[in-house]
């Protein structure tokens, strides 16, 4: 059985690497029609792959030798499978394809946004740099331009959201859940806490963190010399604006390498591998999807970091965050 599991795992790695590469190529350039077609094709394949995967997971979870297998591969793997199995049934295959299509539509729409501001053309990522500038009017103006886009595209965005909510609620009910929240906890493999735990956590945040947050906002307003902190002020903590990293990409990478060299523990060699192998796409550009993520190419044992640098401290924060994911995945 263990040998069969290893063969299955290798097949999953190969399929997973293909799906990861397809998603990466799509998010790198949402205007690339070939990349979009590949993404659509992989979305259509995914439910069938999940169905085959689930059959094997069910067989292993119910296997007579489960206790012996857990000693070999650990019990956590079986806990994750028990969470994943109830989240799929062939009855929702078409719904999953539609869900992926809606996600692609949203990604393409937001990636297409262009903002003319401060004599430059910006996307959703680069317009965000103004939130950390010292000039309050500039901060406010950038936010107005950005949110005007959401207002102009509100009908399409609302339609996508409405369709997605109803689609997911329908999937949950087809699978026997009351709503998508119950399904969502299983899909995210939350095997060590539940809705009740999160509800208690929210209460604690409201009781202890929110009052502290209000105090910090008051102190921030005093630091900035304003009467009240508005939403276009929230990212700034100094009258002079926030400290900015080097604006040259190569200089940023050099400083990152220096930092990891000082830390050691394998981070230095790992980052050099990431740089030399081209396993990073960090600069924002037209047509590129927003946000940041880390994914893994399991067949070659290397992760990939996707981000959108915009010239603020957030570049450093997002990058080091994703590097943590990447290094953990690489070492494990």
What are the residue ranges of the model-derived segments?
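Hydrophobic/aromatic-lined pockets within catalytic cores
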Residues: 165, 210, 214-217, 221, ...
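Short, hydrophobic/aliphatic alpha-helical segments
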Residues: 157-169, 274-278, 304, 330-332
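Active-site-adjacent "gating/activation" loops or surface patches in catalytic cores
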Residues: 125-137, 245-320, 324-329
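A well-structured
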Residues: 1-243, 255
């Amino acid at each position: 059985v263990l040998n069969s599991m290893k063969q299955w795992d290798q097949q999953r790695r190969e399929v997973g690497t293909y799906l990861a590469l397809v998603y990466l190529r799509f998010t790198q350039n949402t205007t690339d029609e070939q990349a979009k077609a590949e993404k659509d094709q992989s979305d259509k394949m995914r439910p069938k792959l999940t169905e085959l995967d689930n059959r094997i997971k069910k067989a292993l979870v119910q296997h007579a030798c489960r206790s012996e297998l857990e000693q070999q591969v650990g019990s956590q793997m079986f806990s994750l499978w028990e969470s994943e199995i109830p989240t799929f049934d062939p009855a929702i295959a078409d719904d999953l394809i539609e869900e992926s299509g809606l996600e692609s539509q949203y990604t393409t729409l937001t990636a297409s946004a262009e903002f003319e501001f401060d004599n430059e053309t910006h996307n959703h990522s680069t317009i965000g740099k103004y939130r950390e500038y010292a000039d309050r009017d500039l901060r406010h103006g950038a936010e107005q331009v950005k949110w005007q886009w959401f207002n102009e595209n509100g009908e399409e965005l609302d339609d996508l959201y409405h369709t997605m909510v109803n689609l997911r609620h329908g999937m949950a009910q087809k699978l026997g859940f009351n709503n998508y929240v119950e399904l969502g906890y299983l899909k995210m493999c939350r095997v060590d806490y539940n809705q009740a735990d999160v509800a208690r956590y929210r209460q604690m945040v409201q009781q202890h963190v929110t009052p502290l947050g209000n105090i910090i906002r008051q102190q921030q307003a005093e630091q900035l010399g304003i009467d009240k902190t508005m939403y276009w002020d929230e990212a700034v903590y100094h009258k002079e604006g926030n400290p900015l990293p080097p604006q040259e990409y190569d200089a940023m990478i050099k400083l990152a390498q220096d930092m990891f060299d000082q830390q050691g523990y394998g981070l230095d060699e790992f980052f050099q591998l990431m740089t030399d192998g081209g396993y990073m796409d960090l600069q924002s550009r037209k047509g590129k999807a927003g946000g940041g993520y880390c994914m893994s190419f399991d067949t070659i044992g290397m992760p990939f970091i996707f981000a959108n640098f915009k010239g603020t401290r957030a570049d450093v924060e997002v990058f080091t965050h994703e590097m943590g994911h990447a290094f953990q995945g690489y070492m494990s």
